[in-house]
């Protein structure tokens, strides 16, 4: 399913279209689990993002790595808030939405220039470059009194990461740029 995100942190007045596979399961107690599968940026309309990404590409190395991984996290957060706000749940006893993201523990990114209706945009796609996986777990509900959204995100190591042990398979993609290192995308993960 495609979602149009206009709430990405740092990019007001921009729209990012993401393709997401997910399933939703609600238990009898009011908890809804959203298990997110494939997640990718498809297109966007955002001149500032193009400038920021090009600046990161020009700087290269750790600057590019940090930008791409940081932006991916912003997309995850924007999707969580967007999806939650389609049907918000209040923080009554046990009522909440849980977003579960199972991520490759080691990723590297291929950045490709794509022509969309005469406009050249840069899209990044991940590839595994090691073994192991981790989980991003976000729990959300809306406080019925304040109207504020209560949100906690935790990262867990599911299996130990061994980065750099697999060469990334870019498939048929032509990579204009590649992130510098094979990196663990789950910061501050705990077991």
Describe each PLM feature range.
Residues 1-43, 51:
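Short N-terminal edge-element motif at the start of the domain
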Residues 28-102:
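Structured domain cores in non-transmembrane regions
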Residues 14, 25, 46, 110, ...:
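Generic recognition of cysteine residues
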């Amino acid at each position: 399913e495609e979602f149009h995100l206009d709430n990405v942190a740092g990019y007001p007045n921009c729209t990012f279209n993401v393709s997401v596979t997910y399933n939703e399961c609600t238990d009898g107690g009011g908890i809804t689990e959203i298990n997110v599968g494939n997640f990718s940026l498809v297109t966007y309309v955002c001149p500032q993002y193009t400038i920021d990404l090009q600046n990161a590409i020009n700087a290269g190395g750790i600057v590019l790595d940090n930008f791409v991984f940081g932006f991916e996290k912003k997309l995850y957060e924007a999707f969580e808030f967007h999806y939650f706000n389609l049907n918000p749940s209040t923080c009554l006893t046990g009522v909440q939405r849980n977003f579960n993201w199972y991520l490759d523990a080691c990723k590297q990114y291929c950045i490709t220039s794509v022509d969309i209706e005469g406009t050249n945009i840069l899209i990044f796609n991940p590839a595994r470059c090691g073994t192991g996986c981790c989980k991003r777990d976000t729990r959300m509900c809306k406080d019925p009194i304040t109207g504020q959204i209560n949100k906690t995100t935790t990262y867990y190591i599911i299996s130990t990461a061994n980065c750099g042990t697999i060469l990334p398979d870019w498939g048929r993609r032509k990579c204009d740029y590649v992130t510098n290192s094979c990196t663990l995308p789950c910061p501050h993960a705990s077991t």
